[in-house]
Amino acid sequence: MLLAVLLAPALQPDAFAAPLDYTEADVRDVRGIYDDSLDGGRGLAESATPPFSSELAIKVAGPKKQLLLSFTNRIRVDFAFTWVAHIRALGLTNFLVGATDDVAVEELTTGKVPCFSMKTNLPQGEWPWGSSSFKALGPHKIELIYKSIQWGLEVVITDIDALVLRDPFPYMARYPDAGFLTTSDHLGNTTADDGLEDHRGIHSAFNIGYMFFRPSAIPLVEEWRRYINEDPRNRWDQGEFNRIARSKWKPGRTDGLSDKRLFWAYQEKVIGGVLPIALFAGGHNYFVSQLAQRMGVPPYSIHTTFQYSAAAGKRHRLREAMVWIDEPSYYDPPGGLLVYAPDVPKALVYPPKGMTTNGHIALIKHQLRQIRSALALAQALGRKLILPEVTCGYDKAWFQL
């Protein structure tokens, strides 16, 4: 087997390539997170970190009363730095990051990230999906939403692994009567334009990892808040939001709505909509189906859902898409880099009788042998191997496609 190898010079810190098929113009320079001048004049490192308050939220939201929110614990602070870097690259200042523990407070403050202390008793380690600690985060998140809209703000709230790559508020303004707009776990887009998903796509699970709320959603959020707070360690915020939002809803009723893709939710008291899954992308739609790339439109957000290997897997996916922010030293290892051009025969990718389980295994094994050889060569040369994109015959999934 012939392995074509290129000994790569160290990448420069500004060597940000466009993700997948995008042009360089579509990708923002997000290196500013390492610039100490990006304090915004707030003196954050010198002052005590405040709690989430109306004074803080309204001041940061500014005259448009629009606020971007996320939150993190100590082991996801690097996600927060990446989240903030992309927002700063957009020229936005109307954002805050909540810290759920004292270590996160210290690191965010030292990193000059506008933040507030959530003062929770949540575990400082991983929050495994479905665990009691994972569910216990829900009331804190809902409280941020509830307070924000009670104070008269429009709010986009995201998980810390849901990156904000374009200013979302001009998009939300297209639907002025919507009380909430939510992302979705739907895996097939129902429209070919950049509008909301139509009513064929609103029955899949709403994903609350990236959501928009207006004060008109207060009736829904109040009920959501009340129900979760009754049993906060056992009731899942996303599951209950889906149930409550669909309580006595009328998805087929469109009278009086600014757009026929909106719908009446929660006892016909609140208007909702599903954001386009190509532009407000979950992990499968962005990294696997690549809907945004095929449309040729840069997404508003990428949320690393449907990924394996917990935080490490999420970091890898975001690095692969060239949207993860590393310190400049990451691109300049002492011994240099090693890249190679993988050999992926067309006959293995498109077997004459179609892909089979054995065909998929043969395709993967062919590529793993090359990776093994490249790893051995990199170790012998003292270089870091840049892993190639691996072509798969089948998609690994635990969910129904």
What residue ranges belong to the model's regions?
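N-terminal signal-anchor transmembrane helix specifying type II single-pass membrane topology
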Residues: 1-19
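N-terminal targeting/anchoring "stem" of glycan-biosynthesis enzymes
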Residues: 15, 294-297, 301-401
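N-proximal low-complexity "stem/linker" segments adjacent to membrane-targeting elements
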Residues: 22-78
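Short, acidic, metal-binding catalytic loop of nucleotide-sugar glycosyltransferases
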Residues: 86-94
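Active-site-proximal specificity loops/subdomain of glycosyltransferases
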Residues: 103-151
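Short beta-strand-to-loop acidic/aromatic patch adjacent to the donor-nucleotide binding site
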Residues: 145, 152-161
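Conserved donor-nucleotide/metal-binding helix-loop-beta segment in metal-dependent transferases, i.e.
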Residues: 162-203
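Catalytic core and acceptor-binding pocket of nucleotide-sugar-dependent glycosyltransferases
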Residues: 203-324, 369-372, 392-395, 400
